[in-house]
Amino acid sequence: MTVAPFDAKALAQGLEQGAQALRLELTAVQQQQLLQHLALIDRWNRVYNLTAVREPAQMLTQHLLDSLAVVAPLRRQTRATAIALLDVGSGAGLPGVAIAVACPEIHVSCVDTVSKKASFIRQVGVELGLTHFQALHARVESLASSNFDVITSRAFASLADFVTLTEAALAPDGVWMAMKGQVPHEEMAVLPSSIEVFHVEPLQVPGLDAERCIVWMHRKG
Protein backbone atom coordinates (compact mmCIF):
# COMPACT_ATOMS: atom_id res chain seq x y z
CA MET A 1 0.00 0.00 0.00
CA THR A 2 1.31 3.44 -0.95
CA VAL A 3 1.31 5.91 1.93
CA ALA A 4 0.78 9.59 1.18
CA PRO A 5 3.82 11.81 1.78
CA PHE A 6 4.03 14.13 4.77
CA ASP A 7 2.64 17.39 3.34
CA ALA A 8 3.62 19.88 6.04
CA LYS A 9 1.78 22.81 4.46
CA ALA A 10 -1.53 20.95 4.08
CA LEU A 11 -1.24 19.50 7.57
CA ALA A 12 -0.53 22.94 9.03
CA GLN A 13 -3.66 24.26 7.34
CA GLY A 14 -5.67 21.30 8.62
CA LEU A 15 -4.39 21.84 12.15
CA GLU A 16 -5.21 25.55 12.05
CA GLN A 17 -8.73 24.88 10.81
CA GLY A 18 -9.22 22.10 13.35
CA ALA A 19 -8.05 24.29 16.22
CA GLN A 20 -10.46 27.01 15.13
CA ALA A 21 -13.33 24.51 15.05
CA LEU A 22 -12.38 23.42 18.57
CA ARG A 23 -12.10 27.08 19.63
CA LEU A 24 -8.53 26.58 20.72
CA GLU A 25 -6.15 29.50 20.61
CA LEU A 26 -2.78 28.04 19.74
CA THR A 27 0.34 30.14 19.29
CA ALA A 28 2.55 29.67 16.24
CA VAL A 29 5.04 27.86 18.47
CA GLN A 30 2.38 25.49 19.79
CA GLN A 31 1.16 24.73 16.28
CA GLN A 32 4.71 23.98 15.19
CA GLN A 33 5.24 21.69 18.19
CA LEU A 34 2.07 19.74 17.37
CA LEU A 35 3.09 19.36 13.73
CA GLN A 36 6.54 18.27 14.85
CA HIS A 37 4.94 15.58 17.01
CA LEU A 38 2.95 14.43 14.00
CA ALA A 39 6.10 14.32 11.86
CA LEU A 40 7.88 12.27 14.52
CA ILE A 41 5.01 9.78 14.68
CA ASP A 42 5.11 9.50 10.89
CA ARG A 43 8.87 8.92 10.88
CA TRP A 44 9.13 6.53 13.84
CA ASN A 45 6.02 4.61 12.83
CA ARG A 46 7.85 3.12 9.86
CA VAL A 47 10.15 1.27 12.25
CA TYR A 48 8.37 1.02 15.59
CA ASN A 49 4.74 0.50 14.54
CA LEU A 50 3.38 3.10 16.96
CA THR A 51 -0.03 3.25 15.31
CA ALA A 52 -2.03 1.38 12.69
CA VAL A 53 -2.87 4.73 11.07
CA ARG A 54 -0.34 5.32 8.29
CA GLU A 55 -1.62 8.34 6.38
CA PRO A 56 -0.45 11.67 7.87
CA ALA A 57 -3.79 13.35 7.09
CA GLN A 58 -5.60 10.60 8.99
CA MET A 59 -3.10 10.91 11.83
CA LEU A 60 -3.97 14.59 12.05
CA THR A 61 -7.68 13.88 12.43
CA GLN A 62 -7.75 10.57 14.26
CA HIS A 63 -4.86 11.26 16.63
CA LEU A 64 -3.96 14.93 16.94
CA LEU A 65 -7.35 16.65 16.64
CA ASP A 66 -8.96 13.81 18.59
CA SER A 67 -6.51 14.53 21.43
CA LEU A 68 -6.94 18.30 21.18
CA ALA A 69 -10.72 17.87 21.49
CA VAL A 70 -10.30 17.18 25.22
CA VAL A 71 -8.33 20.36 25.95
CA ALA A 72 -11.28 22.72 26.42
CA PRO A 73 -13.25 20.25 28.60
CA LEU A 74 -10.11 19.57 30.65
CA ARG A 75 -9.51 23.27 31.24
CA ARG A 76 -13.12 23.74 32.33
CA GLN A 77 -12.86 20.82 34.73
CA THR A 78 -9.56 21.98 36.25
CA ARG A 79 -10.31 25.72 35.96
CA ALA A 80 -7.07 26.07 33.97
CA THR A 81 -4.97 25.63 37.10
CA ALA A 82 -1.58 23.98 37.49
CA ILE A 83 -2.31 20.28 37.96
CA ALA A 84 -0.60 16.93 37.49
CA LEU A 85 -2.05 14.68 34.77
CA LEU A 86 -1.25 11.06 33.97
CA ASP A 87 -1.83 9.63 30.49
CA VAL A 88 -2.04 5.84 30.79
CA GLY A 89 -1.13 3.59 27.88
CA SER A 90 0.02 6.68 26.04
CA GLY A 91 1.38 4.83 22.99
CA ALA A 92 2.55 7.55 20.61
CA GLY A 93 1.98 10.21 23.27
CA LEU A 94 -1.74 10.59 22.77
CA PRO A 95 -3.38 12.59 24.24
CA GLY A 96 -0.56 13.48 26.65
CA VAL A 97 1.74 15.37 24.29
CA ALA A 98 -1.10 17.42 22.79
CA ILE A 99 -2.25 18.36 26.30
CA ALA A 100 1.30 19.27 27.34
CA VAL A 101 1.67 21.53 24.30
CA ALA A 102 -1.74 23.20 24.54
CA CYS A 103 -1.74 23.49 28.35
CA PRO A 104 1.76 24.38 29.54
CA GLU A 105 0.38 24.94 33.04
CA ILE A 106 -0.30 21.19 33.36
CA HIS A 107 2.45 18.77 34.38
CA VAL A 108 1.94 15.76 32.10
CA SER A 109 3.28 12.27 32.69
CA CYS A 110 2.86 9.69 29.91
CA VAL A 111 3.23 6.07 30.94
CA ASP A 112 3.47 3.00 28.72
CA THR A 113 4.58 -0.56 29.42
CA VAL A 114 6.17 -0.90 25.96
CA SER A 115 9.77 0.28 26.08
CA LYS A 116 9.96 1.52 22.47
CA LYS A 117 6.82 3.62 22.94
CA ALA A 118 8.07 5.16 26.18
CA SER A 119 11.38 5.91 24.44
CA PHE A 120 9.54 7.57 21.58
CA ILE A 121 7.48 9.75 23.91
CA ARG A 122 10.62 10.72 25.81
CA GLN A 123 12.29 11.75 22.54
CA VAL A 124 9.22 13.79 21.57
CA GLY A 125 9.43 15.68 24.85
CA VAL A 126 13.09 16.48 24.21
CA GLU A 127 12.66 17.54 20.57
CA LEU A 128 9.59 19.67 21.31
CA GLY A 129 11.32 21.28 24.30
CA LEU A 130 8.43 20.45 26.59
CA THR A 131 8.73 21.48 30.21
CA HIS A 132 6.60 19.94 32.97
CA PHE A 133 6.57 16.72 30.95
CA GLN A 134 7.92 13.22 31.44
CA ALA A 135 7.67 9.81 29.80
CA LEU A 136 7.68 6.71 31.98
CA HIS A 137 8.37 3.11 31.01
CA ALA A 138 6.42 1.40 33.77
CA ARG A 139 3.26 -0.38 34.76
CA VAL A 140 0.71 2.06 36.09
CA GLU A 141 0.41 -0.03 39.26
CA SER A 142 3.95 1.04 40.14
CA LEU A 143 2.83 4.68 40.34
CA ALA A 144 0.78 4.22 43.52
CA SER A 145 0.62 7.25 45.84
CA SER A 146 1.59 9.61 43.00
CA ASN A 147 -1.43 11.85 43.66
CA PHE A 148 -2.32 12.78 40.09
CA ASP A 149 -5.17 15.28 39.83
CA VAL A 150 -6.39 13.84 36.52
CA ILE A 151 -5.80 10.42 35.02
CA THR A 152 -6.70 9.99 31.38
CA SER A 153 -6.63 7.23 28.81
CA ARG A 154 -7.47 7.15 25.15
CA ALA A 155 -7.42 3.46 24.33
CA PHE A 156 -6.30 1.65 27.44
CA ALA A 157 -8.96 -0.68 28.83
CA SER A 158 -12.55 -0.99 29.96
CA LEU A 159 -13.69 1.67 32.42
CA ALA A 160 -13.66 -0.83 35.29
CA ASP A 161 -10.10 -1.96 34.54
CA PHE A 162 -9.01 1.64 33.98
CA VAL A 163 -10.16 2.89 37.38
CA THR A 164 -9.13 -0.27 39.23
CA LEU A 165 -5.58 -0.24 37.88
CA THR A 166 -5.06 3.49 38.37
CA GLU A 167 -6.97 4.38 41.54
CA ALA A 168 -3.90 4.15 43.78
CA ALA A 169 -2.22 6.85 41.65
CA LEU A 170 -5.19 9.25 41.82
CA ALA A 171 -5.24 12.13 44.30
CA PRO A 172 -8.02 11.96 46.94
CA ASP A 173 -10.10 14.57 45.09
CA GLY A 174 -8.84 13.62 41.62
CA VAL A 175 -10.88 12.68 38.56
CA TRP A 176 -10.66 10.22 35.71
CA MET A 177 -11.04 11.49 32.14
CA ALA A 178 -11.70 8.44 29.97
CA MET A 179 -11.76 9.08 26.22
CA LYS A 180 -14.27 6.83 24.49
CA GLY A 181 -16.12 6.43 21.20
CA GLN A 182 -19.80 5.74 21.70
CA VAL A 183 -21.12 6.20 25.22
CA PRO A 184 -20.05 2.93 26.94
CA HIS A 185 -23.27 2.20 28.82
CA GLU A 186 -22.37 -1.43 29.50
CA GLU A 187 -18.95 -0.49 30.90
CA MET A 188 -20.48 2.22 33.06
CA ALA A 189 -22.98 -0.27 34.48
CA VAL A 190 -20.25 -2.52 35.89
CA LEU A 191 -18.00 0.09 37.48
CA PRO A 192 -16.94 -0.58 41.07
CA SER A 193 -19.57 0.64 43.53
CA SER A 194 -17.10 3.16 44.95
CA ILE A 195 -16.74 4.96 41.60
CA GLU A 196 -19.25 7.40 40.14
CA VAL A 197 -19.70 8.78 36.63
CA PHE A 198 -20.47 12.46 37.18
CA HIS A 199 -20.58 13.57 33.56
CA VAL A 200 -20.55 12.12 30.05
CA GLU A 201 -19.36 14.84 27.68
CA PRO A 202 -19.93 14.51 23.93
CA LEU A 203 -17.01 15.56 21.74
CA GLN A 204 -17.01 16.74 18.15
CA VAL A 205 -13.68 16.07 16.49
CA PRO A 206 -13.21 18.16 13.32
CA GLY A 207 -13.16 15.95 10.25
CA LEU A 208 -13.99 12.77 12.16
CA ASP A 209 -17.33 11.15 11.33
CA ALA A 210 -17.56 9.10 14.50
CA GLU A 211 -18.98 9.42 17.98
CA ARG A 212 -16.54 10.50 20.66
CA CYS A 213 -17.06 11.33 24.31
CA ILE A 214 -15.35 11.81 27.65
CA VAL A 215 -16.54 9.78 30.62
CA TRP A 216 -15.72 11.80 33.74
CA MET A 217 -15.49 9.78 36.96
CA HIS A 218 -14.53 10.25 40.59
CA ARG A 219 -14.73 8.44 43.89
CA LYS A 220 -18.08 8.59 45.64
CA GLY A 221 -18.37 10.65 48.78
UniProtKB/Swiss-Prot annotation:
Which GO MF terms are attached to this record? rRNA (guanine-N7-)-methyltransferase activity
Q: Where in the cell is it found?
A: Cytoplasm
Keyword line: Cytoplasm, Methyltransferase, rRNA processing, S-adenosyl-L-methionine, Transferase
Kindly give the Pfam families that the UniProt entry links to this protein: GidB
Query: What GO cellular component is one of the record's annotations?
Result: cytosol
Out of the domains of life, which is the source? Bacteria
Per the record, what are the reactions this protein catalyses? guanosine(527) in 16S rRNA + S-adenosyl-L-methionine = N(7)-methylguanosine(527) in 16S rRNA + S-adenosyl-L-homocysteine
Main localization of the protein? cytoplasm
Q: Which Gene3D superfamilies match?
A: Vaccinia Virus protein VP39
* Residues given in the record as S-adenosyl-L-methionine binding sites: G89, L94, V140, E141, R154
| Protein EC | 2.1.1.170
Cited PANTHER family: S-ADENOSYL-L-METHIONINE-DEPENDENT METHYLTRANSFERASES SUPERFAMILY PROTEIN
Family membership: Belongs to the methyltransferase superfamily. RNA methyltransferase RsmG family.
Protein role = Specifically methylates the N7 position of guanine in position 527 of 16S rRNA.
What's the protein called, per UniProt?
Ribosomal RNA small subunit methyltransferase G
